[in-house]
């Protein structure tokens, strides 16, 4: 009998939990190790930055390793520590297979109670991360972090005491600061340069966000709002003038359980305040679907229309589409093929109209452990 989409999603969460190996379990303490190795073979073509040739690659696709330790105190109270690393390209060198360095993606501690919620401190995802519903494996056309940061150095609270409902709030702190004071900054007053401890230009100084998502009874609904402050670099305006972004993300979807079909509509809006410059407004809408074609095989896709505009200034419109098929060869082995196409049209009064195109297609394999 064909599984419903709801059962498929529940099964996916169960499989995800099963991927982690329990290496220690005694007296209320549980330690798990898990992760995945992911490889993708791809072909891409772009006219952005005057690129005119196609490029093929065989590379790492977000391979990762994590360790999670949970200590149960009793009466529903617990503490948890989580560390996740990723394989990425080296910052220097010419390697393009993305296996050059190991970095820390997430590292946080949690104190919680099953009925009261949990407090999370460290480098972690925020409530905005899980708001939109669109599915992708690699070429996601939604850029949610442009509207609200989806992770960072944060203090967060999450409440899951009501079945199907998640409520959350996060306070973001600066994560990228200068480590040293340069000679220019240490010299004459007003000289440009780096000062140890100061936030790096155009990086997050602080921010706050709240959100809620409901996922039950075949209905998906979510919304998040965030206000994020950035450090503008006054001495060197070429590095950027962004001061503050007020953004919102939302989703609305419905599961047709008997058909194995999920349809959704994601959207976002942001207003960017620039230092002594005109403000910028952005928004997007993105209808999408996920369909269980047969057991262990799923088809998914979404379309996005996005617009950025400055009063009496540059206007950018982007249309993008993504389509993919995945198949589970084994409960811990997933293969997929995914493609995306984006067309961006930029209009400036003195420069005319410029059109850029980008397309990518890839075949990937993930092995979980």
Curated annotation (Swiss-Prot):
Signal peptide range: 1-20
Keywords tagged on the record: Cell outer membrane, Ion transport, Membrane, Porin, Signal, Transmembrane, Transmembrane beta strand, Transport
GO cellular component, one term: cell outer membrane
Pfam family membership, one: Porin_4
Alphabetized CDD domains for the sequence: gram_neg_porins
Subunit structure, interactors included: Homotrimer.
UniProt family annotation: Belongs to the Gram-negative porin family.
Record's protein name: Outer membrane protein P2
Species for this entry: Haemophilus influenzae
């Amino acid at each position: 009998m064909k599984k419903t989409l709801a059962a498929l999603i529940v099964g996916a969460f169960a499989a995800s939990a099963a991927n982690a190996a329990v290496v220690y379990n005694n007296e209320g303490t549980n330690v798990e190790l898990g992760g995945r190795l992911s490889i993708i073979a791809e072909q891409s073509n772009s006219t952005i930055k005057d690129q005119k040739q196609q490029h093929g690659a065989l590379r790492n696709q977000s391979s990762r390793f994590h360790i999670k330790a949970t200590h149960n105190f009793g009466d529903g109270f617990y503490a948890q520590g989580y560390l996740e690393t990723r394989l990425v390209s080296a910052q220097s060198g010419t390697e393009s297979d993305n296996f050059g360095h190991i970095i820390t993606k997430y590292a946080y501690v949690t104190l919680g109670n099953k009925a009261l919620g949990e407090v999370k401190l460290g480098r972690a995802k925020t409530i905005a991360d899980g708001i939109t519903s669109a599915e992708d494996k690699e070429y996601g056309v939604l850029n949610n972090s442009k509207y609200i940061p989806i992770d960072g150095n944060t203090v967060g609270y999450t409440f899951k005491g009501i079945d199907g409902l998640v409520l959350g709030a996060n306070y973001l702190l600066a994560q990228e600061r200068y480590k040293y004071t340069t000679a220019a900054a240490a010299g004459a007053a007003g000289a440009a340069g780096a000062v140890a401890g100061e936030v790096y230009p155009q990086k997050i100084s602080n921010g706050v966000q709240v959100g809620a998502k409901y996922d039950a009874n075949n209905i998906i609904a979510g919304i998040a709002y965030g206000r994020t402050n950035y450090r503008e670099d006054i001495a060197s305006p070429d590095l950027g003038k962004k001061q503050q972004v007020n953004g919102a993300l939302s989703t609305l979807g419905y599961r047709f359980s008997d058909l194995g079909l999920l349809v959704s509509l994601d959207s976002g809006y942001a207003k960017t305040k620039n230092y002594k410059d005109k403000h910028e407004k952005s928004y997007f809408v993105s209808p999408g679907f996920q369909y269980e074609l047969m057991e262990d095989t799923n088809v998914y896709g979404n379309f996005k229309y996005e617009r950025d505009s400055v009063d009496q200034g540059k206007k950018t419109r982007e249309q993008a589409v993504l389509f993919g098929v995945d198949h589970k060869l084994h409960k811990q082995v997933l293969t997929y093929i995914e493609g995306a196409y984006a067309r961006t049209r930029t209009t400036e009064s003195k420069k005319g109209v410029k059109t850029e195109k980008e397309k990518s297609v890839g075949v990937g394999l993930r092995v979980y452990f």
